Structure formats: C-alpha cells, structure tokens
C-alpha cells in the first residue's frame, strides 16, 4: 500500500464523527506537508501551481543547509583552535562534533515551536500553519552554540506565542519570529548572548572535541573592535567563515549559495538584498572616512550577521516591504541602521538584529507612503 493510499484510508477516522476527529488539524498538516493539496475552485477559473506555501518554506530551508553544514564544521574548528589541537583534529571529526552540538538545539527548536503550533491549531480548530518550518531552523543558527537548551526553548515559546500566534498566525506577524526569539534572549539573558565566553563549545561529546579550561575566552572580530583592539582574522578567514560567531552567520560563501538558491527560485527579493548591502556600504564608507569606525566597508559586510540577515531575515516576505519601490527603501534603511548601531553603540557591536526589527516596524509605513505617492501622482495626471 502506497503512502497516499494509506493516508486516504485513514482520512475518515479524522473527519467529523470519526474517533480521531479531535486531531484532524494534525492529519491535515501532515497530509499537505507530504502532498500538494488537491483543491478545486468553487467559483471562477483558476490554475493551481504545485508550489504552495509549504513548498516555498521547504526551498528556504534547503537554502539554509550550506550555512548550517559549515556552521557545524566551524563549531568543531573553533573548539580545536581554542584547545590548541588544530593540527591533530580531522575535518570529519570537527564536523561530527559540531553536528552533535547543534542537532539538539534544532530538535528543541522544532519540538517546542511545532508543539505550540499543533496545540494552538487544535485549540482553535484550524489547520496547522507551516510558517515555523523556516523559523525552526533559523533560530538555532543565530544564537551562540553554548546557549543552554532551556533558554532556547523559552525563547522559541515566547516568539511563537507573542510574535506570531496572537497576531493571527502565519502571514500576520509584524516582526520576524526568529529575530524576536533572539531579541528575547538578548534582553533577558545578555550574559549568554554577548561577551567573549560564549563563542566556543567547551566540552567533549561522545568522545569528540576537546574540553577547554574554565574561564576560557574568545571574542568575535566585532567584539575585538568594540574593545578597541584590531581584527586578528584575515579577510580570507572572514569570507570562508573560520571565525567565532553565531552558528550560521560566519561563512559568506555558504550564505551566498543560499542567496543564489533564493534568487534563482524567485523566493526572495534581490532588490531587498542588494539595497541592504548598499545601505551598509554607504554608511560604512561615511563612518570610516570620518574616522568614526576603524573597519573598512567590506569588513562591515563580511563580519557578524550582516550577510546572513540581509539574505535570510530582511527578505522575509511577511515582515518586509511589499511594494517594489518600498523594497529599495526598506533594504537601504536596514543596512544603514545596522552600521549606525555598530559604530555608535559599542555595547552592542552587532547591530543587524535591531536594524531588521526596526525595518519590520517601518515596512507598513514605507509601503503606505509608496502607494499614496503613486495615487497622488495619478490624481495629478488625471487633472491635467
């Protein structure tokens, strides 16, 4: 019996009157995740594309895989580097160590987030929404590898409930869910999100990795600059991603592969991506020319979460600007704000998280102004 036939055979048990009717939303969620919904328009003529929202989310997850895989390797690399054992560590050993450190966080993120979504759908008698497929993998990639699992679970619960569900679910949230989780952690547990003691895994797992001494410290390049020191990492290491940082944000090459996938499949707006980089470069040039920032413009781009945020966060179709002109303004605003926060607020050397959340808040206003401007222009032409 095929999986399709097996699901069809089970369907009557979940329909009204069936003994498992209370779990119909769970059945529908699994069915539509595995197969394209077989829907017929009740009025008018429509052509249904095979790409629905779940397939779009799946493509975004696929685009994140290069950054995730390199992040796993970098976890092991930073651990071996900190232990002074880089010469004897193997690439596969470092990758497996990183995978064993990261997978529990991904599992906790999905279990807590999807568990809340399932429970919420059951409570409201609605279909399970698919938006958390992307947020579930984004959240572990934008936090330090040393973050305790219970903190991650708490942040996921907060973000899903208070950023998404109470606003109506998928497609109705004002702020990016993954960034809301990170903001919750940043303001609630700053010691676990910033500083120089959180960027390298310090313990062995399943016989892999190295145990680091208590009190070991390792600063990110942006953290070094904030403390008045120069960046020790080479440009090559910055681009490859062999530097301390959150799991998925370090490798520009891996992020670029994800960007190509998103642009090629027309899932994310290249205008938003490009304008974020333009805004960041313009502000970086201004600050560097005035002596306010020691970093070159390209260092601002390749360090921290700038590239990751520009590709995967700023382009969120729900929370970003939707008008074509608005995308340029929205992206430029985020890029410029990220560099401004980095330079003018030494206590928070990253900047990208707050810049994107600020952009999310401004996106509806940007779209409104663009639409009103077009309406006013057409009204003037009509009077001529």
Task: Please tell me what each predicted stretch does.
Residues 112-117, 132-141, 156-163, 254-261, ...:
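Hydrophobic, membrane-inserted alpha-helices
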Residues 127-208:
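Membrane-interface helix-loop-helix junctions at boundaries between adjacent transmembrane segments
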Residues 41-47, 113-124, 161-171, 257-265, ...:
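C-terminal ends of transmembrane helices
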Residues 95-109, 146-155, 238-252, 294-306:
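Structural signature of hydrophobic alpha-helical transmembrane segments
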Residues 153, 174-179, 297-305, 327-329, ...:
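Loop-to-transmembrane alpha-helix initiation sites
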Residues 171-256:
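Long hydrophobic alpha-helical segments that form multi-pass transmembrane helix bundles
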Residues 1-106:
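N-terminal signal-anchor module of multipass membrane proteins
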Residues 273-324:
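A beta-strand-loop signature enriched in Asp, Gly, Thr, and Trp
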């Amino acid at each position: 019996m095929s999986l399709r036939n097996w699901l069809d055979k089970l369907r009557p048990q979940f329909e009204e009157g069936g003994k498992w009717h209370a779990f119909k939303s769970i059945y529908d969620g699994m069915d539509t995740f595995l197969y394209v919904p077989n829907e017929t328009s009740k009025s008018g003529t429509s052509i249904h594309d095979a790409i629905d929202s779940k397939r779009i989310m799946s493509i975004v997850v696929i685009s994140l895989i290069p950054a995730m895989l390199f992040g796993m390797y970098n976890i092991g690399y930073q651990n071996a580097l900190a232990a002074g054992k880089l010469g004897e560590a193997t690439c596969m050993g470092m990758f497996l160590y990183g995978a064993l450190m990261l997978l529990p966080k991904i599992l906790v993120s999905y279990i807590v987030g999807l568990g809340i979504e399932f429970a919420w759908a059951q409570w409201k008698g609605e279909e399970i929404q698919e938006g958390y497929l992307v947020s579930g993998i984004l959240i572990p990639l934008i936090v330090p590898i040393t973050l305790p699992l219970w903190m991650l679970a708490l942040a996921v619960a907060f973000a899903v409930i208070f950023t998404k569900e109470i606003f109506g679910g998928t497609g109705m949230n004002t702020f990016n869910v993954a960034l809301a989780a990170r903001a919750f952690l940043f303001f609630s547990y700053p010691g676990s999100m910033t500083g120089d003691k959180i960027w390298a895994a310090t313990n062995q797992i399943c016989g892999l990795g190295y145990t680091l001494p208590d009190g070991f410290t390792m600063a990110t390049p942006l953290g070094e600059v904030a403390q008045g020191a120069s960046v020790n990492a080479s440009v090559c290491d910055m681009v490859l991603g062999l530097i301390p940082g959150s799991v998925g944000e370090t490798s520009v090459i891996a992020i670029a592969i994800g960007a190509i996938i998103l642009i090629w499949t027309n899932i994310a707006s290249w205008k938003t991506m490009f304008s974020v980089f333009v805004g960041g470069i313009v502000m970086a040039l201004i600050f560097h020319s005035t002596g306010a920032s020691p970093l070159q413009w390209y260092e601002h781009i390749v360090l921290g979460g700038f590239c990751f945020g520009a590709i995967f966060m700023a382009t969120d179709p729900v929370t970003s600007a939707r008008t074509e002109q608005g995308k340029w303004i929205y992206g430029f605003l985020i890029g410029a704000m990220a560099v401004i926060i980095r330079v003018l607020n030494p206590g928070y050397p990253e900047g990208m998280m707050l810049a994107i959340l600020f952009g999310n808040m401004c996106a509806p206003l940007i779209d409104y102004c663009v639409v009103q401007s077009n309406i006013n222009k057409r009204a003037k032409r009509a009077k001529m």
